């Protein structure tokens, strides 16, 4: 057993016997001398190792470091010699090669003073053509051989170091093998946590979006306001908030600015209308009476309807109803006429087909032409009917929105007129009170 092996094995300090392990080492070698005499001369240990027990701990460690340094220097010299030998072989092979015109100009042996545009920072100034990136494919086999030789040299170095310094070297190898295996489990839990967090956040976002789509906005509820709700402003809040089913489908749409107003016309007219409702009930009753009278006047002037489609044409409900009935009857009659025309055209086309079998070719051509014209006319009639139906629905929706806007405008105008009347009445009361106060003070002064 050599000194450096005892150093790494930790046999220099014997805590149980409290003796110096160098003496044990000397006795061990003395007992081992008899079997060593029978060994051949090549297997005998070095005589310098016999003097190691006489050395101190620090001197033995220094001697061990010298041995390691000498071995490493010898290996480096051998590597340098091998590299020089390989470079010389490559130069001889490149000089002996025939001129190949397929090679690019940047693979020339002599480096240029000005670098070519094909050369990179790696290929410029390289001594061999294998160093250029363009000719790496040609020398792939040589590169593989060089890598294989380097791997063999590294393995030899590891074996030599292991023979010189076994305990320290093998412990390092075990640690290096343990570190990469322990690294992946540290990464995977964090990745799993990130995945679960991303899934949870996505689920929360989806739930929030679903709740926002299902819950109607208060602004969209204003679009479902009915006329009778405006005509009865003192209805309870439960009735005002009932039509939420139709507004749930319109939650995704953007409301118009005028439709975003609240339902209560008192709040539309003035900001302090709500305070009037809470504080002064008689004033609210007077306002409702005034509003009813104004609405009756509007209906009488508009012919019994709340709004007028065209102010220049005063139509009553009866006339509008008769007109609507007449239009519906006309539409029905037109549809019946169209169906009859289609049937007649079909009959004519069939009759023409039957006659064409017995008649001449001219009559068959005329029948085909009439059938084609009748088909085109029927298709155009269907298209016209669909177009007029779309126009009718669009006009009805436009009239509905226009009527709602005019109702709101009327409510605001009614509230403004009422507030003006109240202002005039209050001013008159203030003037009367001032006169009474002046008369009272003058009478009091005269009596005093």
UniProtKB/Swiss-Prot annotation:
Annotated region described as Disordered, given as residue ranges: 23-47, 83-134, 238-259, 298-363
Main location (coarse class): nucleus
Gene: gt
Biased composition (Polar residues): 298-310
Positions of the bZIP domain: 384-447
A Pfam family of this chain: bZIP_2
GO cellular component, one term: nucleus
Subunit and partners: Homodimer or heterodimer.
UniProt entry keywords in alphabetical sequence: Developmental protein, DNA-binding, Nucleus, Phosphoprotein, Repressor, Transcription, Transcription regulation
InterPro entries with a match to the protein in the record: bZIP, bZIP_sf, PAR_bZIP
Xref: Gene3D superfamilies: 1.20.5.170
Role of this protein: Represses the expression of both the krueppel and knirps segmentation gap genes. Binds, in vitro, to the krueppel regulatory elements CD1 and CD2. It is required in the early embryo for the development of portions of the head and abdomen.
Protein name, entry field: Protein giant
Natural source organism: Drosophila melanogaster
Processing and modification events after translation: Phosphorylated at multiple sites.
Region (Basic motif): 390-406
């Amino acid at each position: 057993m050599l000194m450096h092996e005892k150093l790494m094995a930790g046999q220099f300090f014997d805590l149980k016997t409290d003796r110096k392990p160098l003496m044990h080492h000397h006795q061990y070698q003395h007992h081992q001398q008899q079997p060593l005499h029978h060994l051949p001369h090549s297997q005998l240990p070095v005589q310098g190792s016999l003097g190691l027990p006489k050395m101190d701990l620090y001197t033995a460690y220094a001697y061990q470091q010298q041995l390691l340094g000498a071995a490493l220097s010898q290996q480096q010299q051998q590597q340098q010699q091998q590299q020089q030998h390989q470079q010389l072989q490559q130069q001889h092979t490149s000089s002996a090669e025939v001129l190949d015109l397929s090679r690019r100009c940047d693979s020339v042996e002599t480096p240029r003073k000005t670098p070519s545009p094909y050369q990179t920072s790696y290929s410029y100034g390289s001594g061999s053509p294998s160093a250029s990136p363009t000719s790496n494919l040609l020398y792939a086999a040589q590169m593989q051989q060089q890598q294989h030789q380097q791997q063999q040299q590294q393995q030899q170095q590891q074996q030599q170091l292991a023979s010189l310094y076994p305990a320290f070297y093998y412990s390092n190898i075990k640690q290096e093998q343990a570190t990469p295996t322990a690294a992946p489990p540290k990464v995977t839990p964090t990745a799993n946590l990130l995945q679960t967090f991303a899934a949870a956040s996505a689920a929360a976002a989806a739930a929030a979006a679903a709740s926002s789509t299902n819950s109607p906005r208060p602004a969209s509820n204003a679009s479902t306001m009915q006329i009778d709700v405006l005509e009865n402003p003192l209805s309870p809040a439960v009735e005002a908030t009932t039509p939420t089913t139709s507004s749930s489908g319109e939650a995704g749409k953007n409301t118009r600015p005028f439709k975003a107003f609240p339902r209560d016309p008192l709040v539309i007219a003035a900001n302090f209308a709500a305070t009037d409702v809470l504080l002064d009930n008689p004033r609210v009753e007077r306002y409702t009476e005034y509003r009813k009278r104004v609405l009756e006047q509007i209906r009488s002037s508009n012919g019994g309807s709340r709004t007028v489609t065209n102010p220049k044409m005063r139509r009553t409900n009866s006339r509008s109803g008769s007109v609507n009935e007449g239009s519906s009857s006309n539409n029905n009659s037109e549809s019946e006429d169209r169906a009859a025309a289609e049937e007649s055209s079909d009959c004519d086309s069939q009759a023409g087909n039957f006659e064409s079998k017995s008649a001449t070719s001219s009559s068959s051509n005329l029948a085909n032409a009439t059938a084609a014209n009748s088909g085109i006319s029927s298709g155009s009639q269907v298209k016209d009917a669909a177009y007029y139906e779309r126009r009718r629905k669009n006009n009805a929706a436009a009239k509905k929105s226009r009527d709602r806007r005019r109702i709101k405008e009327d409510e605001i105008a009614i509230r403004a007129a009422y507030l003006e009347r109240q202002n005039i009445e209050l001013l008159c009361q203030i003037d009367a009170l001032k006169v009474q106060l002046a008369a009272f003070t003058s009478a009091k002064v005269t009596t005093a």
